[in-house]
Amino acid sequence: MNPNQKIITIGSICMVVGIISLILQIGNIISIWISHSIQTGSQNHTGICNQSIITYKNSTWVNQTYVNISNTNVVAGKGTTPVILAGNSSLCPIRGWAIYSKDNGIRIGSKGDVFVIREPFISCSHLECRTFFLTQGALLNDKHSNGTVKDRSPYRALMSCPVGEAPSPYNSRFESVAWSACACHDGMGWLTIGISGPDDEAVAVLKYNGIITETIKSWRKKILRTQESECVCVNGSCFTIMTDGPSDGPASYKIFKIEKGKVTKSIELDAPNSHYEECSCYPDTGKVMCVCRDNWHGSNRPWVSFDQNLDYQIGYICSGVFGDNPRPKDGKGSCGPVYVDGANGVKGFSYRYGNGVWIGRIKSNSSRQGFEMIWDPNGWTETDSSFFVKQDVVAMTDWSGYSGSFVQHPELTGLDCMRPCFWVELIRGRPKEKTIWTSGSSISFCGVNSDTVDWSWPDGAELPFTIDK
């Protein structure tokens, strides 16, 4: 091939390559234009559709990597608009209690990362129910779980997770530093109250939607404490009860009215012969009913009922079916304190229906074992020990602990009444078992006007753990 032919050949090849490159560029421009046209056209359509948003989060914890996949269904038109929870409905008529949740936290914690907790409780907004709990700043089966039988420490915090889930670092939300707490939702935001600090100078920190709004200082300098269950919201105002003073004698008890995290009114109860601790409260036809723990001298439970102006009435559940623990055998009740085996106690609850009462109580008279619900049709006002219905939920051979009430508002359930519910703490570890830690799981039930069943839903963990050996 002579030089002229070489030049012609090279030129032809370059021309062909250039033409191909030009064609590819034109195709690329056309593709981009078509894609842009499709996206612009999609934005002009406003039809209702369901979207699924999948979020992937990588996090590392104790040299192990976890991938949390959160699949959130977003349904167009679903109401997430804030509403004011009215709280003016009456309690739903019920025949028994259906199992609602069980978190199995201790069983899962033998191998997984689960918080050491106590004092769990449940509270619901108009959109969801959450389990709140007081952590010990430690995980199960870890060295920092040692000594967590202690009630008050600077490591304790109020946290929350979706109801029915074991409380872990991966599904829990921090709420407040606290060794005593309560929380509730007014339809627009969460109110949390966390008490922390030294016994003689404790301070309650109020938060609304996570922002500090006010503080309340201990006024008797003797372990300021609150409910360990949900506060109550009615027509935009939330209500809670705090105690300050001795646990074995007369103390000071105050009701607080709170709006958007700010205290608008408070009163001190005039109750010199009563003792109110760890009250379990619920709304009923626009008023608030609280059933509490008498740690001083009553084996039946004291109650306080008040309206939105904090005008109140006080008393004790009259039934001879006694609700506290320890307690004597059922017998003759009293509308004042029943002094037999009245010292000490445990957090509990009851629901009033006219002259009748659903009494939730530990089955054992002397130790925190078993749990049962009893319907006494005249127990709010009469002192006999006859009852109509008994439903077992934890067997006498299994550990129980604190219990408390919570409600599901009509704005959540779609019912025209307030659904009564309760939770039971299932305490494991010290001081009754040979471990270095104390923690608990929980179960919960809601009232239904249909068939229910007797059974036992125990904690079920096999102890001791590896850390205990």
UniProtKB/Swiss-Prot annotation:
Disulfide bridge map: C92-C417, C124-C129, C184-C231, C233-C238, C279-C292, C281-C290, C318-C335, C421-C446
Functional summary from the UniProt entry: Catalyzes the removal of terminal sialic acid residues from viral and cellular glycoconjugates. Cleaves off the terminal sialic acids on the glycosylated HA during virus budding to facilitate virus release. Additionally helps virus spread through the circulation by further removing sialic acids from the cell surface. These cleavages prevent self-aggregation and ensure the efficient spread of the progeny virus from cell to cell. Otherwise, infection would be limited to one round of replication.
The protein's assembly and partners: Homotetramer.
Keyword terms: Calcium, Disulfide bond, Glycoprotein, Glycosidase, Host cell membrane, Host membrane, Hydrolase, Membrane, Metal-binding, Signal-anchor, Transmembrane, Transmembrane helix, Virion
Summary of activators and inhibitors of this protein: Inhibited by the neuraminidase inhibitors zanamivir (Relenza) and oseltamivir (Tamiflu). These drugs interfere with the release of progeny virus from infected cells and are effective against all influenza strains. Resistance to neuraminidase inhibitors is quite rare.
Positions of region (Head of neuraminidase): 91-469
Span list, region Involved in apical transport and lipid raft association: 11-33
Ligand binding (Ca(2+)): D294, G298, D324, N344
InterPro entries (UniProt xref): Glyco_hydro_34 (IPR001860), Sialidase_Influenza_A/B (IPR033654), Sialidase_sf (IPR036278)
Source superkingdom: Viruses
Membrane found in the keyword field: yes
List of glycosylated residues: N44, N50, N58, N63, N68, N88, N146, N235, N365
Positions of region (Hypervariable stalk region): 36-90
GO BP term, example: carbohydrate metabolic process
An example Gene Ontology CC term for this record: virion membrane
Main location: virion
EC number(s) reported in the record: 3.2.1.18
Name of the featured protein: Neuraminidase
SUPFAM superfamilies: Sialidases (SSF50939)
TM regions (residue ranges): 7-27
Residues the record marks as active site: D151 (proton donor/acceptor), Y402 (nucleophile)
Organism whose genome encodes this protein: Influenza A virus (strain A/USA:Huston/AA/1945 H1N1)
Misc: The influenza A genome consist of 8 RNA segments. Genetic variation of hemagglutinin and/or neuraminidase genes results in the emergence of new influenza strains. The mechanism of variation can be the result of point mutations or the result of genetic reassortment between segments of two different strains.
Co-factor requirement: Ca(2+)
UniProt: substrate binding residues: R118, R152, E277, E278, R293, R368
